[in-house]
Amino acid sequence: HIIVSGGIGVATFPALAETLIQKCNAAPEVILAARSKHLILCADEFRAMGCKVHIATDDGSAGEKLYASRMLAKLKPGPNCRVYVCGPMIMMKTTSEVAIAAGADCVVSLEAQMACGDGACLGCVVESKSEKEGEKMVRVCLDGPVFDTTLIDWDAHNMAFDR
C-alpha cells in the first residue's frame, strides 16, 4: 500500500495508515507532497508508526524537488499495490494516471463544497465515466468522498479552479 497526500490532503491518512498496519501487518509507504517544507504535515507521525516516508516539495526545500506523481513513479507500484490519494485535483489526476499505468489499484478522496451534505443540492457533484443515465454525475457527499479513480472523468473537471 502507498499513501499519497498533497498538502492538507494528509488529514485522514494517519488513521488509514494505522488501519492498514493492523489489517495487513505491514506499514504503508507514504508520499507527503507540498509546495514547500513548511507545508509538510505528519511526517514524524507516520515515521513513528513505522511507515517509510518520502517527501516531495515543489521548491526542493525538503525531500526531493518533484511532484507527487513523479515520486510515485519512482516507487514503481505494481498490480499488487493499492494507492490512496488525497490532495489538489491536478495532483490526484496525475498521480492516478501513474498508478493506473503501473497496474496498481487506486482510490482518491475528493473534497467539495457541500451545502446540504445529503445530496439534494448537487453542489458537490463531479462527473463520472459512467454512460448510465443518472450515474454520470456523482455526489461527493453521498456517493463518496472516496472513489475508484477509474470512475472519475478527470478531463471534465476544470483544474484552474483548484488553487
What are these regions (language model features)?
Residues H1-Q113:
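FNR/FR-type flavoprotein reductase catalytic core
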Residues C24-A26, P77-C81, C106, S130-K136, ...:
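Short secondary-structure transition/capping segments
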Residues A48, V126-E127, V138-R163:
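Short Fe-S-cluster ligation motifs
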Residues Y67-A73, A120-V125, D155:
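Short, surface-exposed amphipathic charged segments that create phosphate/polyanion-binding patches used
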